[in-house]
């Protein structure tokens, strides 16, 4: 396998005021034909969201979406009627399959939320959507 080194300062970047985001792969307004995906890894975004702000309800289909809070509180809601707040030490996984709507917000009114969002292309499309969260401090290794 060929070794690829992508320096942090060469990533895509956008600052929308409420969202400061860094993209490892082409995403939203950032497009780099050399960085579409790495195998099944499609998205690796490093996001900082200001207090009380976030991503309004929007759809996903046929993607594994993983969110990892690094600092702060991430509030999740979805069309499967899940509603949860996760924090550092937790991991959220959505298998979006045939389709799911969800929102993600900074649950704090005073502190920034920092989190990673990772998308992985699934092996099988149009499966039943599933949401789960895990407390990695409780995982027996």
Task: Mark where each language-model region is.
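Basic/polar N-terminal segments that are highly enriched at the extreme N-terminus
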Residues: 1-5
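Generic beta-strand structural signal
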Residues: 64, 84, 90-92, 100-102, ...
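Conserved, well-structured core segments that form or line functional sites
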Residues: 97-101, 109-141
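Short beta-strand segments in beta-sandwich/barrel cores
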Residues: 48, 72-76, 91-92, 125
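A short glycine-rich, His/Asp/Glu-containing loop-to-beta-strand
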Residues: 15-59, 63-64, 115, 121-122, ...
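Short beta-strand His + acidic residue motifs that chelate non-heme Fe in jelly-roll/DSBH
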Residues: 76-79, 93-94, 101-109
């Amino acid at each position: 396998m060929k070794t690829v080194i992508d320096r942090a300062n060469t990533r895509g970047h956008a600052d929308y005021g409420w969202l400061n985001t860094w993209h490892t792969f082409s995403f939203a307004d950032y497009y780099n034909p050399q960085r579409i995906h790495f195998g099944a890894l499609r998205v690796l975004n490093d996001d900082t969201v200001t207090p009380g702000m976030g991503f309004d309800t929007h759809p996903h289909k046929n993607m594994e979406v993983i969110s990892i809070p690094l600092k702060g509180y991430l509030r999740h809601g979805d069309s499967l009627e899940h509603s949860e707040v996760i924090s550092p030490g937790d991991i959220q996984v959505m298998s979006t399959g045939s389709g799911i709507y969800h929102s993600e917000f900074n649950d704090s009114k005073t502190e920034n939320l920092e989190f990673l969002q990772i998308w992985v292309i699934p092996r099988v499309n149009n499966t039943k959507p599933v949401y789960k969260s895990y407390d990695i401090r409780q995982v027996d290794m």
